[in-house]
Amino acid sequence: TIGMIYVGPKDDFGYNQSHYEAAMALKGMPGVKIVGEENVPETQAVQKTMQGMISQDGATLLFPTSFGYFNPHILDVAKKNADVRFSHCGGMWDAAKHPKNVGSFFGYIDECQYLNGVIAGHMTKSKKIGFVAAKPIPQVLRNINAFTLGAKSVKPDITCSVIFTGDWSMPVKEAEATNSLADQGVDVFTMHVDGPKVIVE
C-alpha cells in the first residue's frame, strides 16, 4: 500500500495533479494499492494523515509531496515508523542527518525555467517580466534566478519583478499578483505555485 498526500486539490492542473496522475499509473500495477488525501496543510494535520495511512491502511511507502511536510512532520513520523519508507518531494534529505527510512526527490525545474526565460526574453516588448511564487525557499529562488538569467541572455537590460503569495495554492492571490504586475508593465509571466491559474488569468 502506497500513501499519497497532497497539499492542494488533486485536480489543480499542476503540481498536485502531476503527483496524482503518477499515483494512478502505479495503481494499475498488480498488487499495488493507492490511498490518498488531498488538501492536507503543512501542519500537524499531515502527521495525523501519515500515521492514519500507516495504522489504518497498512501503507509501507508514503509520498508526502509538499515542501513544508518535511521538517518536522515527516521526520517525526518516520522516527516512530522505522518499517515505513518516506519519499519527500523537495530535495531536503541529508543522509548524515535524517532517518534511513526517509529519502527525497526533486525535478530539475530550473533548467526548464531558464528556457522559459529565453522565450520570455524574445517575447517581451516592455523588457519587464514577472514571476509569481509561493515561498522564498531554495528551489523557488533557483527557478526565479534561472528564469531571469534566461531572459537576460537575450536582452541584458530585462528586469524581473517577483511577488510571493505565501502559500502553494492561493489562486485568488496569484491572480491578484499577476494583475498587479501587469499594471506595472510586465508583459510575460511565469510561476512557481501548485496550479497554473496565474498563467491562465
Where would I find each of the regions flagged by the language model?
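A residue-level marker of the well-folded mature domains of exported/periplasmic proteins
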Residues: 1-201
